């Protein structure tokens, strides 16, 4: 769903620190480039720790950039391996079938229960996978072969189990040809386990910066954006909008985790240097095991930004660190301009944290996104905010199979950034590349075919284009505003139900090409 309809229920209510979780989870689940599944439990712990911190901690407690050590990062000098050098192994392919793994977070795991308790589409993931795989198989399959879907439910908080699954898929039985991660819950080092170590193709919605695909190349392909060109776009927009400039004091708050440090040092800082900007950088502990340190670091970062006269802030934080940082801004009643983005899903997560409890910190903030945020969940014309062609095709197939409302919902439409369209899009993408690879399907022919896909109708993003050295799909970005629709206005598109949206993303600037990567 594009927005929360729970505004009235929270008007006049006392602050409850867990209140925003249900709303925010309906946005966080979309990326993946997002760490949303792992973060379900993390944020609950953060809230408890944050309350204690805000009540008990004195100002100026040690923390911040001096106490949060950066994890080892991948070098930006790492070069991508071209598809032409991929393995020619056909492991997982027989004369009649292609074994493909579909990892799905187990609904009976605590992470699944907490993370998706209010997301009714989440319960439809396995039926959706079967539906879209069967659609391909019933139409003749892939050059005479049928996809054999191996749906594996797992607990994303159990790292040892995920490592064991990776080894089973890439080395054990049954042999697996590829892994498809529709919603982006198979992330970070687990991606590299499958691709770099296991030399097994992985299509995933979770993304970070170029270094990751370089390490996983030529087997790692993202339906989300590479964050290197996205951060470049963020800086360009920041300058053009007046949020960044030599006369504007800029702060960057970044976690100590390897992908975030990599994004800062290898991409964001060089982008800022090109336009003559030197930011004040504050580091916040980002580990799920460092909740107390994260809270104190966030508090101190805000204190230092405030004392230095910072006017704009770029967050490079996972949800478990972004949440305490915004809470610290609110506690200190200091509200700078935030430059949000798809990086760690800050533009998506922000909508879930208004109007309660962080409206002052987040309402009206803007950012860049490659996603189709700002639309509506129905089949009205695309020009009026309805589905893009890729999502519309997914909806048509789903509605023919499931003409009634999804259980627990009132309407039969699928979510524009929800899990059904995400699985539909990536399954179709895989099938296209596998067909283009021809009868001699192996790892090399598959990734070579992936590298030749252009202008493919995307789902989370309007189109996907790949290349021999372009391992991510999105090609465009837009600027959107996080908007609390109170009083009700036409800024938020009216659903067909006639019930106005409580919050929404409002398009500020239409889609334009992403800067070239590298």
Question: Where are the regions that the model predicts?
Answer:
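Hydrophobic alpha-helical membrane-insertion segments, chiefly the h-region
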Residues: 47-58
């Amino acid at each position: 769903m594009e927005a929360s309809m729970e505004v009235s229920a929270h008007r006049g209510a006392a602050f409850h620190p867990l209140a925003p979780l249900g709303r925010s989870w309906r946005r966080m689940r979309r990326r993946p480039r997002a760490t949303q599944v792992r973060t379900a439990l993390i944020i609950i712990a953060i809230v408890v720790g944050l309350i204690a911190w805000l009540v008990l901690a004195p100002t100026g407690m040690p923390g911040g950039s001096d106490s949060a050590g950066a994890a080892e990062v991948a070098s930006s000098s790492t070069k991508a391996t071209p598809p032409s050098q991929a393995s020619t192994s056909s492991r997982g392919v027989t004369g009649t079938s292609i074994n493909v793994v579909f990892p799905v977070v187990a609904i009976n795991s605590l992470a699944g229960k907490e993370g998706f308790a209010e997301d009714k589409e989440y319960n439809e993931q396995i039926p959706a996978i079967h539906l879209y795989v069967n659609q391909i198989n019933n139409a003749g399959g892939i050059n005479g072969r049928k996809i054999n879907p191996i749906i594996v439910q797992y607990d994303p908080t159990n790292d040892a189990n995920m490592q064991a699954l990776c080894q089973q898929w890439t080395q054990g039985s049954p042999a697996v040809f590829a892994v498809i991660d529709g919603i982006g819950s198979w992330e970070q080092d687990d991606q590299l386990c499958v691709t770099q170590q296991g030399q097994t193709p992985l299509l995933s919605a979770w993304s970070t910066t170029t270094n990751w695909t370089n390490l996983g190349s030529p087997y790692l392909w993202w339906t989300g954006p590479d964050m290197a060109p996205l951060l470049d776009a963020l800086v360009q927009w920041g300058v053009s909008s007046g949020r960044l400039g030599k006369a504007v004091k800029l702060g960057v708050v970044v976690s100590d985790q390897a992908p975030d440090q990599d994004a800062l040092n290898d991409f964001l800082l060089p982008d800022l240097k090109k336009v003559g900007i030197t930011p004040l950088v504050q580091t916040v502990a980002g580990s799920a095991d460092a909740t107390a340190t994260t809270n104190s670091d966030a508090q101190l970062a805000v204190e230092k930004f405030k004392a230095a006269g910072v006017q704009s802030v770029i967050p490079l934080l996972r949800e478990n660190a972004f949440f305490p940082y915004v809470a610290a801004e609110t506690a200190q009643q200091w509200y700078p301009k935030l430059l949000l983005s798809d990086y760690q899903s800050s533009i998506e997560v922000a909508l879930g944290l208004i109007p309660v409890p962080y409206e002052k910190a987040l309402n009206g903030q803007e950012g860049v996104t490659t996603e189709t945020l700002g639309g509506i969940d129905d089949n009205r014309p695309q020009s009026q905010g309805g589905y893009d062609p890729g999502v519309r095709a997914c909806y048509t197939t789903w509605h023919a199979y499931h003409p009634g409302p999804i259980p627990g919902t009132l309407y039969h439409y699928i979510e524009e950034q929800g899990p059904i369209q995400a699985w539909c899009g990536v399954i179709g993408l895989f099938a296209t590349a596998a067909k283009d690879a021809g009868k001699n399907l192996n790892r090399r022919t598959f990734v070579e075919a992936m590298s030749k896909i252009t202008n493919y109708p995307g789902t989370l993003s309007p189109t996907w284009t790949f290349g021999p050295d372009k391992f991510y799909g999105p090609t465009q970005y837009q600027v959107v505003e996080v908007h609390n629709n109170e009083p009700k206005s036409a800024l938020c598109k009216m659903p067909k139900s006639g019930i106005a949206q409580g919050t929404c993303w409002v398009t500020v600037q239409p889609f334009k090409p992403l800067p070239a990567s590298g």
